[in-house]
Amino acid sequence: MYLIVGLGNIGEKYQYTRHNVGFLVIDEMAKNLQTSNVNNSNFQSTLLKSGYNLFAKPTTYMNNSGVAVHSIKEYYKIDLENIIVIHDDLDLPFGTVKFKIGGGHGGHNGLKSLDSHIGKDYIRVRIGIGKPQNKDDVANFVLSDFSKEELNKLEDIIKHTINAIEALKTADIDEVKSKFTLK
């Protein structure tokens, strides 16, 4: 079983923000699959199931994502190598998609929470959102909406990311890196 987690913040006002790119990928994946809702308030997530895949959007807000993912991981006894986390990355230019296992949180509070609750060795799908011109403006930047131009490009980036996630279930991460990394 795979647990595919999109990081983001709940609420309509955050729907198309840079910080919610993980949620956007999960939403698009769910559109193309037959899914059923898993109702369990202990999971603190919107959780969908399709075959041997679980798709989670933690409802704890970004900074406590690890609490939600930990409860799902423990309940379903999912190994870390079968957890795929999709998140925004300030250190990558907009539209870049990269993959890795483990590593630091790079100041990302969602990853920081995950690392402290489940460990670090899960699969990370990093989607570049670019950086603000002023370093002091990071919080406002990640919580701002994508521009129209970015949203137009994002559709293809999300489709590409979904194909990569499907490949991650059957291929070695190095194969996925060489085939699906977008720069």
UniProtKB/Swiss-Prot annotation:
Q: List the taxonomic lineage.
A: Bacteria, Pseudomonadati, Campylobacterota, Epsilonproteobacteria, Campylobacterales
Which GO terms of type biological process are on file?
A: protein quality control for misfolded or incompletely synthesized proteins; rescue of stalled ribosome
Residues binding tRNA: 14, 61, 63, 109
Site annotation (Discriminates between blocked and unblocked aminoacyl-tRNA) points to 9
According to UniProt, the name of this protein is Peptidyl-tRNA hydrolase
May I have one GO cellular component term?
cytoplasm
Q: Which family does it belong to?
A: Belongs to the PTH family.
Q: Where is this site: Stabilizes the basic form of H active site to accept a proton?
A: 88
Protein's job:
Hydrolyzes ribosome-free peptidyl-tRNAs (with 1 or more amino acids incorporated), which drop off the ribosome during protein synthesis, or as a result of ribosome stalling.
Oligomer and partners: Monomer.
Q: Which SUPFAM superfamilies match?
A: Peptidyl-tRNA hydrolase-like
- At the top of the EC hierarchy, this enzyme's class is hydrolase
What PANTHER family does its record include?
PEPTIDYL-TRNA HYDROLASE (PTHR17224:SF1)
The main place the protein resides is cytoplasm
Q: Which UniProt keywords apply?
A: Cytoplasm, Hydrolase, RNA-binding, tRNA-binding
Q: What is its EC number?
A: 3.1.1.29
Catalytic residues, chain numbering? 19
Cytoplasm: is it a keyword of this entry?
A: yes
Catalytic activity line of the entry: an N-acyl-L-alpha-aminoacyl-tRNA + H2O = an N-acyl-L-amino acid + a tRNA + H(+)
Q: To which species is this protein native? A: Aliarcobacter butzleri (strain RM4018)
Question: What positions belong to coiled-coil segments?
Answer: none
Gene it is expressed from: pth
- What Gene Ontology molecular function terms does this protein carry? peptidyl-tRNA hydrolase activity; tRNA binding
Where is this protein localized, as stated in its record?
Cytoplasm
Q: Read off the Pfam families from this record.
A: Pept_tRNA_hydro
